[in-house]
Amino acid sequence: MIKEGFLIKTPKKLIALLGPSGSGKSALSIELAQELDAEIFSLDSLSIYKDINIASAKPSLKERKNIKHYALDHLNIDEKNNAPLFKTLLEDAMRVSSKEILLIVGGSSFYLKSILEGLSRMPKLSGEEVVKIEREIATLSNPYIFLKSIDPNMAFKIHPNDTYRTHKALEIFYATCTPPSEYFKANPKKPFEHAISLFALSIEKSALHNNIKRRTKNMLHSGLVEEIKALYTQYPKDSQPFKAIGVKESVLFLEKRLTLKELEEAITSNTMKLAKRQNTFNKTQFNNLYVGSAEEVRHAILKHSKSGIKG
Protein backbone atom coordinates (compact mmCIF):
# COMPACT_ATOMS: atom_id res chain seq x y z
CA MET A 1 0.00 0.00 0.00
CA ILE A 2 1.51 3.35 -1.12
CA LYS A 3 0.73 6.62 0.61
CA GLU A 4 2.33 9.99 -0.19
CA GLY A 5 5.35 8.36 -1.79
CA PHE A 6 6.13 6.11 1.18
CA LEU A 7 5.79 2.34 1.33
CA ILE A 8 3.52 1.58 4.28
CA LYS A 9 4.44 -1.78 5.75
CA THR A 10 1.57 -4.18 6.29
CA PRO A 11 1.01 -4.43 10.05
CA LYS A 12 1.68 -8.05 11.01
CA LYS A 13 -0.39 -10.06 13.40
CA LEU A 14 1.84 -12.87 14.68
CA ILE A 15 0.07 -16.02 15.88
CA ALA A 16 2.00 -19.00 17.25
CA LEU A 17 0.46 -22.47 16.97
CA LEU A 18 2.40 -24.84 19.22
CA GLY A 19 1.88 -28.44 20.26
CA PRO A 20 3.64 -31.78 20.63
CA SER A 21 4.76 -33.95 17.71
CA GLY A 22 1.74 -35.79 16.27
CA SER A 23 -0.86 -33.34 17.61
CA GLY A 24 -2.00 -32.16 14.17
CA LYS A 25 -0.36 -28.70 14.07
CA SER A 26 0.56 -28.87 10.38
CA ALA A 27 -2.91 -29.87 9.16
CA LEU A 28 -4.58 -27.20 11.31
CA SER A 29 -2.09 -24.53 10.21
CA ILE A 30 -2.80 -25.23 6.51
CA GLU A 31 -6.54 -24.98 7.18
CA LEU A 32 -6.12 -21.70 9.12
CA ALA A 33 -3.75 -20.19 6.55
CA GLN A 34 -6.34 -20.82 3.81
CA GLU A 35 -9.18 -19.35 5.86
CA LEU A 36 -7.20 -16.30 7.01
CA ASP A 37 -5.16 -15.69 3.85
CA ALA A 38 -2.06 -16.07 6.02
CA GLU A 39 1.47 -17.38 5.51
CA ILE A 40 3.34 -19.88 7.68
CA PHE A 41 6.68 -19.61 9.45
CA SER A 42 8.02 -23.07 10.31
CA LEU A 43 9.37 -23.25 13.87
CA ASP A 44 10.95 -26.67 13.45
CA SER A 45 14.55 -27.60 14.17
CA LEU A 46 14.54 -30.37 11.53
CA SER A 47 12.46 -28.89 8.69
CA ILE A 48 14.99 -26.06 8.48
CA TYR A 49 17.39 -28.55 6.83
CA LYS A 50 17.53 -29.33 3.13
CA ASP A 51 17.05 -32.99 2.13
CA ILE A 52 15.37 -34.04 5.41
CA ASN A 53 11.81 -34.30 4.16
CA ILE A 54 10.38 -37.54 5.54
CA ALA A 55 12.01 -37.45 9.00
CA SER A 56 10.83 -33.85 9.52
CA ALA A 57 7.28 -34.47 8.20
CA LYS A 58 7.83 -31.39 6.03
CA PRO A 59 4.76 -29.91 4.29
CA SER A 60 4.24 -31.33 0.80
CA LEU A 61 5.28 -29.39 -2.31
CA LYS A 62 1.58 -28.94 -3.13
CA GLU A 63 0.91 -27.42 0.30
CA ARG A 64 3.93 -25.16 -0.07
CA LYS A 65 2.81 -24.09 -3.54
CA ASN A 66 -0.61 -23.05 -2.23
CA ILE A 67 0.66 -21.42 0.97
CA LYS A 68 3.99 -19.67 1.38
CA HIS A 69 6.16 -21.31 4.08
CA TYR A 70 9.25 -19.70 5.61
CA ALA A 71 12.29 -21.28 7.33
CA LEU A 72 12.18 -24.54 5.37
CA ASP A 73 15.24 -25.96 3.54
CA HIS A 74 17.48 -23.17 4.82
CA LEU A 75 20.50 -25.12 6.13
CA ASN A 76 22.79 -27.83 4.84
CA ILE A 77 23.06 -30.94 7.01
CA ASP A 78 26.47 -29.97 8.44
CA GLU A 79 25.29 -26.50 9.56
CA LYS A 80 23.88 -25.66 13.01
CA ASN A 81 20.48 -24.25 13.86
CA ASN A 82 19.87 -22.07 16.93
CA ALA A 83 17.52 -19.45 18.37
CA PRO A 84 19.33 -16.39 16.88
CA LEU A 85 19.00 -17.93 13.40
CA PHE A 86 15.26 -18.51 13.86
CA LYS A 87 14.87 -14.91 15.10
CA THR A 88 16.66 -13.58 11.99
CA LEU A 89 14.53 -15.76 9.70
CA LEU A 90 11.33 -14.67 11.48
CA GLU A 91 12.24 -10.99 11.10
CA ASP A 92 13.06 -11.61 7.42
CA ALA A 93 9.67 -13.29 6.93
CA MET A 94 7.88 -10.37 8.59
CA ARG A 95 9.73 -7.97 6.30
CA VAL A 96 8.99 -9.73 3.00
CA SER A 97 5.50 -11.14 3.67
CA SER A 98 2.69 -9.13 2.11
CA LYS A 99 0.04 -10.82 4.26
CA GLU A 100 -1.41 -9.33 7.42
CA ILE A 101 -1.17 -12.58 9.41
CA LEU A 102 1.88 -14.77 9.89
CA LEU A 103 1.31 -18.13 11.60
CA ILE A 104 4.34 -19.40 13.55
CA VAL A 105 3.92 -23.18 13.61
CA GLY A 106 6.06 -25.92 15.12
CA GLY A 107 7.23 -27.99 18.04
CA SER A 108 10.53 -26.19 18.76
CA SER A 109 8.99 -24.02 21.49
CA PHE A 110 12.35 -23.58 23.25
CA TYR A 111 13.45 -21.34 20.38
CA LEU A 112 10.24 -19.29 20.52
CA LYS A 113 10.67 -18.74 24.26
CA SER A 114 14.26 -17.59 23.67
CA ILE A 115 13.10 -15.18 20.95
CA LEU A 116 10.30 -13.74 23.12
CA GLU A 117 12.50 -13.29 26.20
CA GLY A 118 15.26 -11.79 24.11
CA LEU A 119 18.69 -12.89 23.01
CA SER A 120 21.99 -11.48 24.18
CA ARG A 121 24.47 -10.46 21.51
CA MET A 122 26.80 -13.44 21.09
CA PRO A 123 30.54 -13.18 20.39
CA LYS A 124 31.35 -13.34 16.67
CA LEU A 125 33.65 -16.27 15.92
CA SER A 126 35.43 -17.51 12.82
CA GLY A 127 35.06 -21.13 11.71
CA GLU A 128 38.55 -21.90 13.04
CA GLU A 129 37.73 -20.41 16.45
CA VAL A 130 34.53 -22.48 16.67
CA VAL A 131 36.47 -25.69 15.91
CA LYS A 132 39.10 -24.80 18.53
CA ILE A 133 36.45 -24.12 21.20
CA GLU A 134 34.59 -27.35 20.37
CA ARG A 135 37.85 -29.26 20.86
CA GLU A 136 38.47 -27.57 24.22
CA ILE A 137 34.99 -28.51 25.47
CA ALA A 138 35.35 -32.08 24.15
CA THR A 139 38.44 -32.61 26.35
CA LEU A 140 36.50 -31.86 29.56
CA SER A 141 35.67 -34.98 31.56
CA ASN A 142 32.63 -33.26 33.13
CA PRO A 143 31.62 -29.98 31.42
CA TYR A 144 29.01 -29.10 34.08
CA ILE A 145 31.49 -29.50 36.97
CA PHE A 146 33.96 -27.32 35.06
CA LEU A 147 31.26 -24.66 34.52
CA LYS A 148 30.50 -24.78 38.25
CA SER A 149 34.18 -24.16 39.03
CA ILE A 150 34.48 -21.10 36.75
CA ASP A 151 30.99 -19.64 37.21
CA PRO A 152 28.90 -21.00 40.12
CA ASN A 153 26.14 -18.41 39.47
CA MET A 154 25.63 -19.61 35.90
CA ALA A 155 25.82 -23.29 36.88
CA PHE A 156 23.12 -22.69 39.53
CA LYS A 157 20.70 -21.62 36.74
CA ILE A 158 21.36 -24.72 34.62
CA HIS A 159 20.26 -28.28 35.40
CA PRO A 160 23.26 -30.69 35.48
CA ASN A 161 21.60 -32.77 32.72
CA ASP A 162 21.02 -29.75 30.45
CA THR A 163 23.98 -30.38 28.15
CA TYR A 164 22.80 -27.84 25.55
CA ARG A 165 22.86 -24.82 27.89
CA THR A 166 26.04 -26.02 29.62
CA HIS A 167 27.73 -26.24 26.22
CA LYS A 168 26.52 -22.75 25.22
CA ALA A 169 27.80 -21.26 28.50
CA LEU A 170 31.22 -22.86 27.99
CA GLU A 171 31.37 -21.59 24.40
CA ILE A 172 31.00 -18.04 25.76
CA PHE A 173 33.69 -18.66 28.39
CA TYR A 174 36.24 -19.97 25.89
CA ALA A 175 35.37 -17.28 23.31
CA THR A 176 35.61 -14.32 25.70
CA CYS A 177 37.68 -15.58 28.68
CA THR A 178 34.83 -14.19 30.78
CA PRO A 179 32.47 -16.09 33.10
CA PRO A 180 29.15 -16.39 31.19
CA SER A 181 27.14 -14.64 33.95
CA GLU A 182 29.47 -11.62 33.65
CA TYR A 183 29.19 -11.68 29.86
CA PHE A 184 25.37 -11.67 30.01
CA LYS A 185 25.45 -8.79 32.52
CA ALA A 186 27.47 -6.76 30.03
CA ASN A 187 25.27 -7.90 27.10
CA PRO A 188 21.68 -7.88 28.41
CA LYS A 189 18.84 -9.59 26.56
CA LYS A 190 16.67 -7.54 24.23
CA PRO A 191 13.06 -8.78 24.32
CA PHE A 192 11.33 -9.31 20.97
CA GLU A 193 9.73 -6.06 19.82
CA HIS A 194 6.57 -7.60 18.38
CA ALA A 195 3.66 -9.22 20.21
CA ILE A 196 3.03 -12.89 19.48
CA SER A 197 -0.30 -14.45 20.44
CA LEU A 198 0.21 -17.98 21.75
CA PHE A 199 -1.99 -21.03 21.15
CA ALA A 200 -1.20 -24.70 21.82
CA LEU A 201 -2.90 -27.95 20.89
CA SER A 202 -3.73 -30.40 23.64
CA ILE A 203 -4.58 -33.96 22.65
CA GLU A 204 -5.63 -36.95 24.75
CA LYS A 205 -2.71 -39.31 25.46
CA SER A 206 -4.08 -42.44 23.74
CA ALA A 207 -5.08 -40.45 20.63
CA LEU A 208 -1.60 -38.88 20.52
CA HIS A 209 0.01 -42.31 20.87
CA ASN A 210 -2.08 -43.65 17.96
CA ASN A 211 -1.17 -40.61 15.83
CA ILE A 212 2.54 -41.09 16.55
CA LYS A 213 2.37 -44.84 15.78
CA ARG A 214 0.63 -44.12 12.47
CA ARG A 215 3.06 -41.31 11.67
CA THR A 216 6.08 -43.56 12.31
CA LYS A 217 4.65 -46.31 10.05
CA ASN A 218 3.99 -43.74 7.30
CA MET A 219 7.55 -42.39 7.55
CA LEU A 220 9.05 -45.87 7.24
CA HIS A 221 6.77 -46.74 4.29
CA SER A 222 7.68 -43.42 2.61
CA GLY A 223 11.41 -44.21 2.65
CA LEU A 224 12.75 -42.76 5.91
CA VAL A 225 15.68 -45.20 6.12
CA GLU A 226 16.68 -44.56 2.49
CA GLU A 227 16.54 -40.79 3.08
CA ILE A 228 18.86 -41.00 6.10
CA LYS A 229 21.20 -43.52 4.44
CA ALA A 230 21.86 -41.10 1.56
CA LEU A 231 22.67 -38.26 3.99
CA TYR A 232 24.67 -40.29 6.53
CA THR A 233 27.19 -41.34 3.87
CA GLN A 234 27.64 -37.73 2.70
CA TYR A 235 27.96 -35.66 5.87
CA PRO A 236 29.98 -35.66 9.14
CA LYS A 237 28.54 -38.14 11.64
CA ASP A 238 28.32 -35.48 14.38
CA SER A 239 26.06 -33.17 12.29
CA GLN A 240 23.21 -31.72 14.39
CA PRO A 241 20.28 -33.36 12.50
CA PHE A 242 21.73 -36.85 13.07
CA LYS A 243 20.82 -36.47 16.78
CA ALA A 244 17.12 -35.91 16.00
CA ILE A 245 14.37 -38.45 16.69
CA GLY A 246 13.63 -40.52 13.60
CA VAL A 247 17.11 -39.85 12.29
CA LYS A 248 19.27 -41.24 15.12
CA GLU A 249 17.23 -44.47 15.29
CA SER A 250 17.51 -44.90 11.50
CA VAL A 251 21.29 -44.58 11.85
CA LEU A 252 21.27 -47.38 14.47
CA PHE A 253 19.26 -49.52 12.05
CA LEU A 254 21.74 -48.82 9.23
CA GLU A 255 24.55 -49.85 11.58
CA LYS A 256 22.63 -53.11 12.17
CA ARG A 257 22.15 -52.29 15.86
CA LEU A 258 18.34 -52.39 15.57
CA THR A 259 15.94 -54.64 13.67
CA LEU A 260 13.18 -53.04 11.56
CA LYS A 261 10.61 -53.82 14.28
CA GLU A 262 12.89 -52.32 16.97
CA LEU A 263 13.42 -49.26 14.76
CA GLU A 264 9.69 -48.61 14.54
CA GLU A 265 9.23 -49.16 18.29
CA ALA A 266 12.20 -46.89 19.16
CA ILE A 267 10.98 -44.00 16.99
CA THR A 268 7.44 -44.30 18.41
CA SER A 269 8.65 -44.51 22.02
CA ASN A 270 11.14 -41.62 21.69
CA THR A 271 8.56 -39.44 19.92
CA MET A 272 6.08 -40.07 22.76
CA LYS A 273 8.72 -39.02 25.31
CA LEU A 274 9.47 -35.90 23.26
CA ALA A 275 5.75 -35.07 23.03
CA LYS A 276 5.47 -35.29 26.82
CA ARG A 277 8.42 -32.89 27.23
CA GLN A 278 6.96 -30.51 24.64
CA ASN A 279 3.58 -30.49 26.42
CA THR A 280 5.19 -29.78 29.80
CA PHE A 281 7.38 -27.04 28.33
CA ASN A 282 4.47 -25.28 26.61
CA LYS A 283 2.27 -25.36 29.70
CA THR A 284 4.96 -24.18 32.14
CA GLN A 285 7.14 -21.78 30.15
CA PHE A 286 4.68 -19.40 28.47
CA ASN A 287 2.37 -16.76 29.91
CA ASN A 288 -1.00 -16.09 28.24
CA LEU A 289 -1.01 -19.39 26.37
CA TYR A 290 -4.40 -20.60 25.13
CA VAL A 291 -4.51 -24.42 25.29
CA GLY A 292 -7.30 -26.48 23.77
CA SER A 293 -8.41 -29.16 21.32
CA ALA A 294 -7.90 -28.64 17.57
CA GLU A 295 -11.46 -27.33 17.18
CA GLU A 296 -11.18 -25.05 20.24
CA VAL A 297 -7.83 -23.65 19.10
CA ARG A 298 -9.10 -23.19 15.54
CA HIS A 299 -12.13 -21.25 16.79
CA ALA A 300 -10.00 -19.14 19.18
CA ILE A 301 -7.45 -18.25 16.47
CA LEU A 302 -10.17 -17.32 13.96
CA LYS A 303 -11.89 -15.14 16.55
CA HIS A 304 -8.61 -13.52 17.62
CA SER A 305 -7.37 -12.89 14.09
CA LYS A 306 -10.58 -11.22 13.03
CA SER A 307 -10.57 -8.92 16.06
CA GLY A 308 -9.13 -5.44 15.76
CA ILE A 309 -6.32 -6.17 18.21
CA LYS A 310 -2.91 -6.37 16.58
CA GLY A 311 -0.56 -8.96 18.05
Curated annotation (Swiss-Prot):
It catalyses: adenosine(37) in tRNA + dimethylallyl diphosphate = N(6)-dimethylallyladenosine(37) in tRNA + diphosphate. Catalyzes the transfer of a dimethylallyl group onto the adenine at position 37 in tRNAs that read codons beginning with uridine, leading to the formation of N6-(dimethylallyl)adenosine (i(6)A). Its cofactor is Mg(2+). The gene is miaA. Belongs to the IPP transferase family. One of its GO terms (biological process) is tRNA modification. This is tRNA dimethylallyltransferase. Monomer. GO terms for molecular function: ATP binding; tRNA dimethylallyltransferase activity. Disulfide bonds: none annotated. Substrate binds at S21, G22, S23, G24, K25, S26. Its EC number is 2.5.1.75. ATP binds at G19, P20, S21, G22, S23, G24, K25, S26. InterPro entries: Dimethylallyltransferase, IPT, P-loop_NTPase. Residues 44-47 are annotated as: Interaction with substrate tRNA.
